[in-house]
């Protein structure tokens, strides 16, 4: 199992929740700890005639380090997740759209990290297969 250490903020919380689900939180004593730093940026992509943005791109960049419990770092990586969303004139709708964008970006980032770690673990096990007890 892998213990996931959550970065601060809403996107960090969502990312940790998705990774906990994917990596089997509580299934066994963790052999690794996954720590992450994330940067979230929002860029205007669609602009109305009055020069007000009505579409945004949300980019989530995650730098992660997988550390063996009781040891040092064994794997590092960087992934980038980008999604777009509409921004409505109504404040609540705009907030809901931004939160939906954060949710989709975190889900996409978690899938990318999960696949990266799965590929690394499979390669590691292929090089040094475990001896049955």
Regions found by a protein language model. Name each.
Residues 22-27, 66-70, 112-125:
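Sec/Tat-exported extracytoplasmic proteins
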Residues 26-78, 83-100, 104:
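Surface-exposed short loop/turn segments
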Residues 1-28, 122-133:
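A structural "domain/chain start" motif
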Residues 96-133:
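C-terminal/domain-edge helix-coil "capping" segments
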């Amino acid at each position: 199992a892998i213990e996931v250490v959550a970065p601060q903020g809403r996107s960090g919380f969502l990312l940790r929740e998705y990774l906990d689900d994917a990596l089997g939180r509580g299934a066994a004593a963790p052999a690794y700890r996954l720590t992450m730093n994330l940067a979230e940026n929002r860029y205007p992509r669609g602009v109305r005639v009055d020069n007000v943005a009505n579409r945004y791109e949300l980019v989530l960049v995650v730098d992660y380090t997988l550390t063996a419990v009781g040891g040092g770092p064994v794997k590092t990586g960087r992934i980038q997740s980008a999604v777009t969303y509409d921004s409505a004139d109504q404040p609540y709708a705009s907030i809901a759209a931004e939160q939906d964008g954060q949710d989709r970006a975190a889900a996409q980032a978690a899938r990318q990290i999960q696949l990266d770690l799965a590929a690394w673990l499979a390669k590691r096990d292929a090089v040094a297969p475990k001896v049955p007890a």
